Amino acid sequence: SLAMAMTYKWAFLNVPMGGAKAGIFAVPEELKCERSDLREAFGRGLKSLVAQGVYFPGLDLGTTLEDLYSIMEGAGRPLVGEQIDGSHATALTVFETARQVVKYSHRELSDVRVGIEGFGKVASAVAELLAGSGAIIIGVSTIDGMISSENGLDVQTLLSLKNEFGDRLVHHYPAVEVTAPESLYSLDVDLLIPGARPRVINEKNVSSIEAKWIVPIANAPATWEAEKSLDEMGILFIPDFVANCGGILSSAMRSDYFDLEDVRYLVETTFAELVFALLQESELRGESFKEFVRAVTWQNHLMLSDPSTGFPGMRKRLPQLIKDRDWHGVKSRIGYRIHRRNPKSNGVIHQSALDRYAELTLGSMIN
């Protein structure tokens, strides 16, 4: 299910890549080795796959840019140049998805109550973005427990405690009771953000969920049966490959010589427009959002898998794009070509290249 989620993410972005998932299940202390030794050994195990262009490791749960540097060193393909922190990019798409869902529901973030599972790099960044927009963080859980406050938790306090105590921050937040981690799901909130393990929403707890909207950080956060129940309960469930695609979006954009600010621009413009358009279209068709967007994305995957269509299915889509965009389309294509040859170009050329990238990827879903 995790590899499938990655496949859907690439297809949603309209990038011709398949999906895979791998990880290291080990405790360095028990093996009497350093974390860096494990990372490099993992990289050496991937060496032939990386050399053949079959598999490219990336960041996910419990990993950092430093980990990725070590893995790629072990794989014989050391990363060159400044990389984009994929965890921050993931936070951007999760936040923007939530913002568009709230907007589509004719609400304001300033009166939205939020529950967040986990408080790692992505979840804490999402909490900061939400709080900065006025949302009220009612509850936060880690593996050590859940804390909540009807008046809202102070995110800056949570961030300070996270830096000092990690997951045990819940035991150090003042004047709150620590309950079981799973009690987060039954909180009276508008927005629930599952942010840790797969299938945390299941047949045992789905009936207790009070949220109106679920926007996940985690991959595969709900079982298929639980997703069906959420539909029946009238709860809007946003698939993982939509909400948390920021990490691989940043990876793809870094390959085309864009930076984090470019990722932010694309998320706040084309990505935001796409999420809102998909919400509209699914309602017009009378279909659940998750089923509609899965069908559209799978069609993208099939088109991208067809070698006759090129990257990314543009031979079929390019004439209409040219017709729709006229001179702007010509300018953006020229800018993109110049940018590829000279990534340090800026100003109009850089913006044209970014517009072209948007057209080739997320923008083609809107058209």
Region annotations inferred by a language model:
Residues 1-85, 325, 331-337, 341:
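N-terminal ligand-binding/catalytic initiation module
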Residues 2, 94-102, 126, 248-252, ...:
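Buried hydrophobic packing segments
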Residues 54-60, 79-81, 139-142, 193-194, ...:
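General beta-strand structural signal in soluble alpha/beta enzymes
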Residues 85-186:
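Glycine-rich phosphate/diphosphate-binding loop of Rossmann-like nucleotide-binding domains
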Residues 122-126, 200-203, 222-224, 245-247:
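Short glycine/serine/threonine-rich phosphate/pyrophosphate-binding segments
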Residues 145-238:
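Rossmann-like adenosine-cofactor binding region
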Residues 212-367:
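Adenosine-phosphate binding glycine-rich loop
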